[in-house]
């Protein structure tokens, strides 16, 4: 945090538009550095995990791109965002031309690495859901999903 010069000023309010908001930009850089990522988006406005995930998916995927869920079905609430459930034409990723594939877990609850290798060759996003969500399967360990 000292390297990025985080100070009390980073937490002051702004105009709301975010133009030149030193605090937002600084905290994004701190999170990116802490998690070893290219970039980060840190906002108090995300109201749920589905909101955060859908923002990330909409930010990355475009018409013609493919998303592959490599750990079976996603969260129930994410199914409508993707377009595999809910009303057609309501503005899902599929409605906007994103292709969706799914690789189910094997009977022992582990990812099917052979099928995953086949399906992700043309994918823009390989979606890994570690949490069991509302399903009855156990959560996946980090060692199990580290590919």
Regions found by a protein language model. Give the residues of each.
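Conserved beta-loop-alpha segment that forms the PLP phosphate-binding cup at the N-terminus of a helix
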Residues: 40-67, 74-85
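PLP-dependent aminotransferase-class I/II
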Residues: 76-79, 84-143
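Glycine-rich phosphate-binding segment of PLP-dependent enzymes
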Residues: 3-37
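Catalytic cores of large soluble enzymes that bind and process phosphate-bearing ligands
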Residues: 15-23, 41-48, 108, 137-140
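Conserved small/polar residues in nucleotide/adenosyl-binding loops
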Residues: 1-5, 145-147
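Structural signal for conserved beta-strand scaffold positions within catalytic alpha/beta enzyme cores
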Residues: 42, 69, 102-104
